[in-house]
């Protein structure tokens, strides 16, 4: 794997992820301004992409490591937005909206974990294989 292919895979994935995140913000954030739904959707979709990728890469022998870099480091990394989430959470805290802040924190963190596991489950069901999670 040459460095130029690594850079290209990550860059292409990150560009697509960032454009998708921007589009989600434009399309969804105006729906319910107190809770930026576009940011939440971006983080949840990115977590699902990571779960699917982790599970899929583990079941396909010989798959180029570039796919993992493209999907997780690039696409999911460009799509997810911890910095925007943190800024939005801080804004709610500064306004004294503690309940909304706690709800937003729970939705982002709990939802992301749930969607990552759902992504892994999806591949497990499609492949009729195990999740790879310790029981």
UniProtKB/Swiss-Prot annotation:
Keywords: Cell inner membrane, Cell membrane, Ion channel, Ion transport, Membrane, Metal-binding, Sodium, Transmembrane, Transmembrane helix, Transport. GO terms for biological process: cellular detoxification of fluoride. GO terms for molecular function: fluoride channel activity; metal ion binding. It is found in: Cell inner membrane. The chain crosses the membrane at residues 7-27, 37-57, 70-90, 105-125. GO terms for cellular component: plasma membrane. Pfam families: CRCB. It is a multi-pass membrane protein. Na(+) binds at residues 77, 80. It catalyses: fluoride(in) = fluoride(out). Coiled coil: none annotated. Na(+) is not transported, but it plays an essential structural role and its presence is essential for fluoride channel function. Disulfide bonds: none annotated. Fluoride-specific ion channel. Important for reducing fluoride concentration in the cell, thus reducing its toxicity. Belongs to the fluoride channel Fluc/FEX (TC 1.A.43) family. PANTHER family: FLUORIDE EXPORT PROTEIN 1-RELATED. This is Fluoride-specific ion channel FluC. The lineage of its organism: Bacteria, Pseudomonadati, Pseudomonadota, Gammaproteobacteria, Lysobacterales.
């Amino acid at each position: 794997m040459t460095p130029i292919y690594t850079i290209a895979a990550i860059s292409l994935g990150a560009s697509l992820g960032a454009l998708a995140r921007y589009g989600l913000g434009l399309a969804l954030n105006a729906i319910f301004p107190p809770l930026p739904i576009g940011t939440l959707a971006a983080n949840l979709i990115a977590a699902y992409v990571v779960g699917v990728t982790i599970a899929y890469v583990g079941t396909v022998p010989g798959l180029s490591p570039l796919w993992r870099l493209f999907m997780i480091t690039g696409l999911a990394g460009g799509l997810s937005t911890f910095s925007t989430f943190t800024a939005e959470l801080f804004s709610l805290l500064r306004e004294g909206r503690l309940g909304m802040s706690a709800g937003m924190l729970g939705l982002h963190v709990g939802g992301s974990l749930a969607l990552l596991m759902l992504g892994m489950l999806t591949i497990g069901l499609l492949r009729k294989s195990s999740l790879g999670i310790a029981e």
